[in-house]
From Swiss-Prot:
GO terms for cellular component: mitochondrial inner membrane; respiratory chain complex IV. The chain crosses the membrane at residues 7-29, 51-71, 90-110, 127-147, 167-187, 205-225, 247-267. Component of the cytochrome c oxidase (complex IV, CIV), a multisubunit enzyme composed of a catalytic core of 3 subunits and several supernumerary subunits. The complex exists as a monomer or a dimer and forms supercomplexes (SCs) in the inner mitochondrial membrane with ubiquinol-cytochrome c oxidoreductase (cytochrome b-c1 complex, complex III, CIII). Its EC number is 7.1.1.9. Its main location: mitochondrion. This is Cytochrome c oxidase subunit 3. The lineage of its organism: Eukaryota, Fungi, Dikarya, Ascomycota, Saccharomycotina. It catalyses: 4 Fe(II)-[cytochrome c] + O2 + 8 H(+)(in) = 4 Fe(III)-[cytochrome c] + 2 H2O + 4 H(+)(out). Component of the cytochrome c oxidase, the last enzyme in the mitochondrial electron transport chain which drives oxidative phosphorylation. The respiratory chain contains 3 multisubunit complexes succinate dehydrogenase (complex II, CII), ubiquinol-cytochrome c oxidoreductase (cytochrome b-c1 complex, complex III, CIII) and cytochrome c oxidase (complex IV, CIV), that cooperate to transfer electrons derived from NADH and succinate to molecular oxygen, creating an electrochemical gradient over the inner membrane that drives transmembrane transport and the ATP synthase. InterPro entries: Cyt_c/ubiquinol_Oxase_su3 (IPR024791), Cyt_c_oxase_su3_dom (IPR033945), Cyt_c_oxidase-like_su3 (IPR000298), Cyt_c_oxidase_su3-like_sf (IPR035973), Cyt_c_oxidase_su3_a-hlx (IPR013833). It is an enzyme of class 7 (translocase). Keywords: Membrane, Mitochondrion, Mitochondrion inner membrane, Translocase, Transmembrane, Transmembrane helix. It comes from Candida parapsilosis (Yeast).
């Protein structure tokens, strides 16, 4: 479908998208993944089979969900003004919920860090914890995330101005930077001197950084999809809701990481 025809079909203010099964399927898959991780952490599972199965179901549900969204917006012309408004409002509510989740985890961390008990040796970090230096991989990851914020902003401005080539380059660079961040985060976990079972410090540290890492993996998938859609001429300078939500998602995760770096890595060390 050409952009002119698609724009004509999207002018009226009616909601054309029908009910979708994928949101509820994705929600149950995520809940199953959370339960699997919790049970595995407490030793109720002998292996990681259910975690791997949950990850597969999450990715499968999200793949079909994204496929339907792309088909509805690009090929069917169902993303009218009302649909776009609903997508933007829904994503803003998602961002607010994510901020509240991270706020609760920061609260849990600071509750023990500000007033450590005798069980923690009256000190923070607790006695016996070999903390990760904030001047090593965490600092490098911070620089990488700030750089990704620059490249995605460059891509956003290029998209608004109708410069497809620079938009594509910006999304490619951003995708590579976020993937590099995830890889360095994995290396940090691999060589860390403590685990999630090492008391309140280990549990709050891995809960904060691990949840952020899961969101970064999700962001990588979204960036790959946006990069492909830019390459496939799916976005125009006036219609690019998927790109805008991905860009906002990246900036929100950038800000959350800055709080993690300052509070957990720098102040908490």
């Amino acid at each position: 479908m050409t952009n002119n025809v698609r724009g004509y079909l999207q002018l009226h203010p009616f909601h054309l998208v029908g009910p979708s099964p994928w949101p509820i399927f994705t929600s149950f898959s995520l809940m199953d993944l959370a339960f699997s991780i919790a049970l595995n952490s407490h030793g109720y599972m002998a292996n990681n089979f259910y975690i791997i199965l949950s990850i597969i179901t999450v990715l499968y549900s999200m793949t079909l969900w994204f496929k339907d969204i792309i088909a509805e917006s690009t090929y069917l012309g169902d993303h009218t003004i009302a649909v776009k408004r609903g997508l933007n409002q829904g994503f803003l509510l998602f961002v607010v919920s994510e901020i509240l989740i991270f706020a609760s985890l920061f609260w849990a961390y600071l509750h023990s860090a500000v007033n450590p008990t005798m069980d923690l040796g009256m000190s923070w970090p607790p006695v016996g914890i070999d903390v990760i230096s904030p001047a090593e991989l965490p600092l490098l990851n911070t620089i990488i995330l700030l750089a990704s914020g620059v490249t995605i902003t460059y891509a956003h401005h290029a998209l608004i101005n109708g410069n497809r080539a620079n938009t594509l380059y910006g999304f490619i660079y951003s995708t590579l930077l976020i993937a590099l961040f995830v890889m360095f985060q994995f290396l940090e976990y691999k060589y860390a001197g403590f685990t999630i079972t090492d008391g309140v410090y280990g549990s709050t540290f891995y809960s904060l950084t691990g949840l952020h890492g899961l969101h970064m993996i999700m962001l990588t998938i979204m960036l790959v999809i946006c990069t492909w859609r830019v390459y496939n001429y799916d976005f125009t300078n006036t219609s690019h809701v998927g790109a805008e939500t991905t860009i906002l998602y990246l900036h929100v995760l950038d800000v959350i990481w800055l709080f993690i770096y300052i509070i957990v890595y720098w102040w908490g060390s």
